[in-house]
Design a protein with these regions (language model features):
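Conserved alpha-helical substructure of the radical SAM core
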Residues: 34-37
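A short helix-loop-beta-strand connector motif used in the catalytic cores of GNAT acetyltransferases and
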Residues: 50-63
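Short amphipathic alpha-helix in the helical subdomain of ABC transporter nucleotide-binding domains
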Residues: 40-43
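Acyl-donor (CoA/ACP) binding surface of acyl/acetyltransferases
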Residues: 1-32, 48, 65-174
Length: 174
């Protein structure tokens, strides 16, 4: 286990999480910000990328597990993401649709912010969010983040405007 909150724990994903990950990444509505659902090969590539991030950085997107049922309901964690000419430490999150609007993403994202500041000793952490993804924007705001920049990213053959949210360690009480 990497992190624990009141209702959740976050741990590294492993191959046995493939089916749970499919419930997220193969769902059209969940993946609208990515221009569509993934297929099995893309889900496997995503999982492999997280596992290699754990080895390279010591962090990545982690499985979010509901304590009450021991079920993986989403993913949330820290990744290094390209933004214009640099790489940013980003809090990312994506949950099964069944668990939307219950505060789980905010709870997990706040724990990741604390981890970034206290364990990784980061001075700032970001969330890069598509301009049409209102629910994720609300999570970022609840995590004390503000928009600092915008940029059009090219992904899956589509130009997508993204906003860059930031929170700085010196601005928050941990």
């Amino acid at each position: 286990m990497i992190l624990e909150t009141e209702r959740l724990y976050l741990r590294e994903m492993e191959q046995s999480d493939f089916e749970s990950l499919c419930k997220i990444l193969k769902d059209e509505e969940t993946m609208y910000a990515y221009e569509g659902a993934f297929n099995d090969a893309e889900v496997q590539e995503w999982l492999d990328r997280q596992i290699s991030r754990y080895q390279k950085y010591g962090f990545g997107l982690w499985a979010v597990v509901l304590k009450e049922t021991d079920e993986m309901i989403g993913q949330c964690g820290l990744t290094m993401q390209p933004w214009k000419e640099k790489e940013l430490l980003e809090i990312g999150y994506l949950f099964q649709r069944l668990y939307w609007h219950k505060g789980y993403a905010t709870e997990a994202a706040k724990a990741c912010k604390k981890y970034a500041f206290e364990v990784l000793n980061a001075d700032e952490v970001y969330s890069i969010i598509r301009d049409t993804n209102v629910a994720s924007q609300k999570v970022a705001v609840r995590n004390s983040m503000i928009v600092t920049d915008s940029w059009t990213k090219h992904y899956r053959g589509v130009d997508m405007l993204h906003d860059c949210y930031v929170v700085r360690k010196k601005q928050v009480d941990l």
